[in-house]
Amino acid sequence: MEFTVVQGDIAAESADALVNAAGTSLRMGSGVAGALRRAAGGPINEEATSKGPVDLGEAAVTDAYELDADYVVHAAAMPHHGDRQATEASIREATRSALAEADALGCESVVVPVLGTGVAGFEFETGAELVCEEVAAYDPESLSEARVIAYSDSEYRTLEAVADRVR
């Protein structure tokens, strides 16, 4: 599977599946989830929350509505209770779950944000390392392209350096 890193707004990406950085309730609030919710139009938040709550590390799939994708895979790296903080295990499990869901749907391309960072509180560089390690180790059936995405210039530079070490 080709593994690249890109910079930009995940809601503007084109792929078979876009991964949402979700909490266990699957409610689409701010950050990556907010960007996807606003760009998708339609009842994506309602569809997502109807599939939750899910266990930490699990993923659920919705339609992508107006996004340039077929599906949004909502990967729960953050609990919506307690301290609401992501962990190494939750980031790894959510990344694997997202890739497996996209693969099971027959997707060939997927865009994955650095799960567990931002409002979920995990340090970006370490989170990027965990996500990149899981993407690099994944043995796909249908997926042929995975892009890990960062929004800001500084996060992209960090992601690029991490991916170069991991690949």
Model-found features: residue ranges?
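Glycine-/small-residue-enriched capping loops at alpha/beta junctions
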Residues: 1-88, 92-104
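Phosphate/ribose-phosphate-bearing ligand recognition and processing surfaces
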Residues: 79-167
